[in-house]
Amino acid sequence: MVVQAAIPLLVEIGPSVTTLQIARAAGISEPTIFRAFTDKNELLTACLAHVSDPGHVVQALEAIEPTMPLPERLVAVIETIRAQGERTGAVANAVRLAGAARPRTHESMSEEERDRLSESRNSSYASLHAAVAAVFEPDADALRLPVEDVATLVLAIVMALGRGGSWDTGIASITTDGLADLILHGITTHHPPSAAPSPGD
């Protein structure tokens, strides 16, 4: 309950959020927080672990109504992954700025730790990929590519955009609806123009 209440505040306020603000959002007294957590840093670290759990976004993807039209389901997939990525990034940045957790570099890890990290990331991606593919499964016959390939492409595009921060503001902005339309229909008309004549024709 405390962690769930703290995450939106971390996204909105950042590392300056106080335990009193978190307690009020959770509907408890401030001292109650410290019965579960040693200090604010431990709470922030727990928030990062919670928001990084891929199970939350997988559940959200599984909740997308399969009878919705394909364009609406695609928008829902993009919004779900995008929101999760932005939320995770905001919390991770707040935790980093607060000094609650120092990220380990790849070089500082043992081989066993690197293997565990790689396995965890692969497992997380596999569960996310399966959930996205399942959303498109009802329209498998209408797609040009297998649903697994569609899921791979959608994830690659949305995750790549997410690495640059918010992608719906600024001069190079793109809306979720615009991205969904691009994925569904590409950049050409249904009847592409004929090839330009070669010199000498």
What residues fall within each predicted segment?
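Short, hydrophobic secondary-structure boundary micro-motifs
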Residues: 18, 56, 60, 90-96, ...
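Amphipathic alpha-helical linker/stalk segments
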Residues: 49-77
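Helix-loop "lid/cap" segments that line or gate small-molecule binding pockets
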Residues: 63, 79-86, 93-106, 182-187
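Amphipathic alpha-helical packing segments from all-alpha helical-bundle domains
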Residues: 68, 72, 90, 94, ...
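Hydrophobic/aromatic residues within well-ordered alpha-helical segments
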Residues: 40, 47, 51, 77, ...
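C-terminal peripheral helix-coil segments that are non-catalytic and often amphipathic
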Residues: 76, 83, 126, 130-147, ...
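Residue-level marker of structural boundaries
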Residues: 42-43, 49-53, 83, 101, ...
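Helix-turn-helix
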Residues: 1, 5, 9-42, 46
